[in-house]
Amino acid sequence: MRIKIGIVGCGDIAQVHHVPWLTELAEEYEIVGVCDVSESAAKYLAEWYKIPNYYTSHEDLLNSDVDAVLLCHTDPKTRIAIDAIKAGKYVFIEKPICLTVDDVDLMIEEKSKSGVVVQTGYMKLFEPAYEFARSEAETMDDISLIEIRHMHPNNKLHVDQFRTRKFGDISQELIESTTKIRNDDITRALGESAGLEARTAYMTLCGSLIHDMYGLRNIMGTPSKVLNTEIWKRPDGTSKGINFILEYPSGAKATVTHMDLPDLWDFDETLKIYGDTKRITVSYATGFSKNQSSALVQEIDSNGNHQRQNNIFLYVSSD
């Protein structure tokens, strides 16, 4: 039996990834409806992919016969996620699931009442290059340093390679109210005294850098302390980049750097794991491409020979 799924949010990530992939997995999923506050976007996506229903209200989607919903609309996603859980729908939430710990606790509470499955979109845990690197890291008992570097261009440079459509039919009032809710959530998370650079750096952590952080946690576990944090500011006071150093109970350190470099097309995201006898380097492709990442392993074998193995992970069909 196929899972009947509905999608909330018809922007770039839905058009580039979610709807095409779910369509390819037609033996397992049936997209029965899409929803967006932009009626034009919802109608376009429904017509292009021959999806039978489109909505501008998530309540209407939840009142249909969907088994599950995929939430990839503009943050925050808390309200619609909780409505979906209360409606008894299984929920997949694009990162971040929310912006405050209190909202996570609220989702967990509602989930425990309903018994549905709620999952967040931490897809890079299943990136073949990452899976390979993690299995290699599990053989190391002398990890001393992990280095994450994420030099992020404007997503538009990569999204423009795909057939996407944008529409201008969302009211200014709705845009402003959504922005206020998001800003209020950031204030709840950081406090009233947080400056603009901290607020924008926090959204970087909740945005593109979240992939690096959950990947790091999946390999190293929970750090024992934060040793240092620095935020670079733009002239307008927003965050240009962030760097921090974490320490783990083993004594290992992790250095994490994220920079917004909007104008150059090149996407540079790496995970490096250093030990005395083995080094692993994962190079990620942009999040809008299909598996094109690589994992380089340098090590000394049992005979004392130095080896270098570069693994390229090409696109493999999702079925």
Residue map of PLM features:
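N-terminal Rossmann-like dinucleotide-binding module
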Residues: 1-49
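Beta-loop-alpha module in the N-terminal Rossmann-like domain of NAD(P)-dependent dehydrogenases
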Residues: 44, 49-110
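Hydrophobic residues in well-ordered beta-strands that form the structural core
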Residues: 93-94, 118-120, 282
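A contiguous active-site-proximal alpha/beta segment in oxidoreductase catalytic domains
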Residues: 99-179
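Mid-domain beta-loop-alpha active-site segment that forms a flexible
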Residues: 121-128, 158-223
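C-terminal glycine/acidic-rich active-site capping loop/insertion
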Residues: 165-169, 173-196, 270-319
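Contiguous beta-strand/loop segments that form the cofactor/metal-binding neighborhood of enzyme cores
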Residues: 196-288, 317-319
